[in-house]
Amino acid sequence: MTVRTRVAPSPTGDPHVGTAYIALFNLCFARKHGGQFILRIEDTDQSRSTPESEQAILDSLRWLGLEWDEGPDVGGAAGPYRQSERKEIYAQYVQQLLDAGHAFKCYRTTEELDMLRAARKEAGIHSALKQSDLMLTEQEQAEREAAGIPYVVRMKVPEEEGACQVTDLLRGNIDLDWSMVDAQILMKSDGMPTYHLANVVDDHLMKITHVIRGEEWINSAPKHILLYQYFGWDVPVFCHLPLLRNPDKTKLSKRKNPTSILYYKQAGYLPEALTNYLGRMGWSMPDESEKFSIQEMLNHFDIARVSLGGPVFDIEKLNWLNGLWIREDLDDAALAQRLVDWKFNQDNLLAVIPHVKQRMETLGDFLPMVSFLAANTLGITEESFKGNKLDLEDQKKVLQFALWQLDTMRTWERDDIFATLKGLADGMGIKLKDFLAPLFVAISGSTASFSVMDAMVLLGSDLSRARLRVAVEVLGGAGKKVLKRYEKEFAALSQLNEESDAE
């Protein structure tokens, strides 16, 4: 048997460090066993998937030194490797399940589903919705079918009491109650599969032997095992890695820490150091050494050494490790070249010069005006904001609301950023000049910078958002009570904007 592993990210946003973490362990496991590592793009969510996001995933994983044997860009015998290009394949298997009575067409509307869930909640029923809850009479189904009402295809799941036993490479046997497993949607009304169907079909057809993924998928394993049984296929070996955590032990999220690989690239981290750090997430070298290369990790890799305690992604620890790599592995010439490749190259200079050229009298004027673009910390304090018109509490609210609003943006272009911020300023009833003042300080360290929108484009979305988070903390942060109040006000503001747009 040839060991085959895979990583299957969704191209719906910036490439996540969690994707790199899962990819690294899949790569190491495959290489250790003389096998193959596959990259698959799970783009069934066509409303959110973008080619730009896919390319960013490919570029980021390669920047980290993670290479795959098969994938959308390198091809392979099991392709295509984008799920959006496999729609006809999934349709065949959905029909197979329908013909065998393992799935059913569900014509229930969103309103009906909401009513069903509300009634169950009121009755104190906590089990998942099953086919007996969802299926219509033959007459009702025929009427809806004749009316052309859209339907989804759902899988049938056990309704009797009992448990599904999931065998995990790290955890052993796990018993999961069937009562909590719902009649999962397998095919959406647009004909695209959900993750659960596409995942199982692709893993089988691509001959994946070991499914190494995050522990958030443990509760979905019964559905996947059931699908393998329905199709009469062998179940691959499951291995669920522990989730990355914030220092406060909560799940790693961009609301508390930068999670995009692009952030770390733009902030000046070495790819070797970031990969090294991800390799230490729940795993350790036999000699407990903290600094090691991918090749050294491969040489000593044993997945049994993975610890199930939630590994903490601590940026301070990453900073320390990155410093070791700079000092111990780069001579002066190599470091100079890394600096050029990172920021001080012609492409970057040409992007910046138009924003400062008209203000320059000597070449010496250039660096003071743009140094904030290359700085990891700006050294701002509460005092930095006191010259602005809004009081400090209102400035903090502006920064937090701006951060939340910018989080919703699909593109990061100047005009889009301006429209987003202006709309928020209007909604909050604040003059744009006063609204932007705290953002100038947060992004550039002063109010004397060139356009804050241009600065945010040059910094990129991740660095920009990270600086806004820092500024909120500088102004005292948002504790639980304040955050709850902010969230309520922001939700009301968003609702007003939606109603205004509808008119």
From Swiss-Prot:
Motif 'HIGH' region: where?
A: 9-19
Query: What Enzyme Commission number(s) apply to this enzyme?
Result: 6.1.1.17
Q: Which GO terms describe its biological process?
A: glutamyl-tRNA aminoacylation
What is the top EC class of this enzyme, as a single word?
ligase
Subcellular location per the Swiss-Prot or TrEMBL entry: Cytoplasm
Motif 'KMSKS' region residues? 251-255
Q: Source organism's superkingdom?
A: Bacteria
Name the Pfam families for this protein.
Answer: Anticodon_2 (PF19269), tRNA-synt_1c (PF00749)
Family affiliation: Belongs to the class-I aminoacyl-tRNA synthetase family. Glutamate--tRNA ligase type 1 subfamily.
Q: Which HAMAP family match?
A: Glu_tRNA_synth_type1
Q: What's this chain's function?
A: Catalyzes the attachment of glutamate to tRNA(Glu) in a two-step reaction: glutamate is first activated by ATP to form Glu-AMP and then transferred to the acceptor end of tRNA(Glu).
Q: What's the protein called, per UniProt?
A: Glutamate--tRNA ligase
User: What is the species of this protein?
Assistant: Saccharophagus degradans (strain 2-40 / ATCC 43961 / DSM 17024)
What lineage is this protein's organism placed in? Bacteria, Pseudomonadati, Pseudomonadota, Gammaproteobacteria, Cellvibrionales
